[in-house]
Amino acid sequence: MKIESTRFGTLDVAPEQIIHFPHGIPGFLGEKAFVHLPHDENSPFSFLQSTAEADLSFLLIDPFSFIPEYEFVLSDEMAGELELSEENPPQVFLIGTVREKITDMTVNLLAPIVVNRNKSIGRQIILDKTEYSIRHKLFSEAKASETPEGGK
């Protein structure tokens, strides 16, 4: 299957690589099929590209690479909807936003993306009863001062 992307060009994707979001993603409820594109093999960064809209992709971040204490509880209903189990564990991502400088990047802790890779099902979960922010600065001031301009 060929997918057009303004960011990545033409992608040749196998049907089993497509992650289905039955409820869409808040703000993009009509978009129900995406492909997950790792940045590099061991990178905590990746992308979620719409299969239908060439200009719709999200920067995803592995939260545990930057915020090891990040945690939340999925309801039994949500775990059931995503068909999660010991054999089908969740994969969790945060949507990131890059500002003018990479050191000002923020992530949405309040609405993680939860994916069952084995079943190719995903959902953006909006957490309640939490102090998490939708604009959590990814790099602390200490880490930011160690990162050269341009993020290299």
From Swiss-Prot:
Under the subunit heading, UniProt states: Interacts with translational regulator CsrA and flagellin(s).
| Residues passing through the membrane, by range | none
What is one Gene Ontology biological process annotated in the Swiss-Prot or TrEMBL record? regulation of translation
Subcellular localization, as worded in the UniProt entry: Cytoplasm
Q: Which InterPro entries match?
A: Flagellar_assembly_factor_FliW, Flagellar_assmbl_FliW_dom_sf
Entries under Pfam families matching the protein: FliW
What cellular component terms from Gene Ontology apply here? cytoplasm
Record's protein name: Flagellar assembly factor FliW
